[in-house]
Swiss-Prot record:
A single MF term (Gene Ontology): structural constituent of ribosome
Keywords: Ribonucleoprotein, Ribosomal protein
Cellular-component GO terms for this entry: ribonucleoprotein complex; ribosome
Gene name tied to this protein: rpmB
Similarity-based family: Belongs to the bacterial ribosomal protein bL28 family.
Record's protein name: Large ribosomal subunit protein bL28
Species of origin: Syntrophus aciditrophicus (strain SB)
TM annotation in the entry: none
Length: 65
């Protein structure tokens, strides 16, 4: 299961957790993806998409009812 937004392509970001003792461990931050039924802009068909909440709030996607 890919954790990538179907609209903007936003995916996981890798960095470090840094403790008080300055120990570093790998950490992955995932985008807030929502699985939606959306209308396709070209054909008007209903498709299942994984969309990040930023794209959803910005109005890049039209939700199907």
């Amino acid at each position: 299961m890919s954790r990538i937004c179907d609209v903007c392509g936003k995916g996981p970001v890798v960095g470090n957790n840094v403790s008080h003792a300055n120990n570093k461990t790998k950490k992955v931050w995932y985008p807030n993806l929502q699985s939606l039924r959306c209308l396709d802009g070209k054909t008007g068909a209903v498709k299942r998409m994984k969309v990040c909440t930023r794209c959803l709030r910005s109005g890049f996607v039209k939700k199907a009812l």
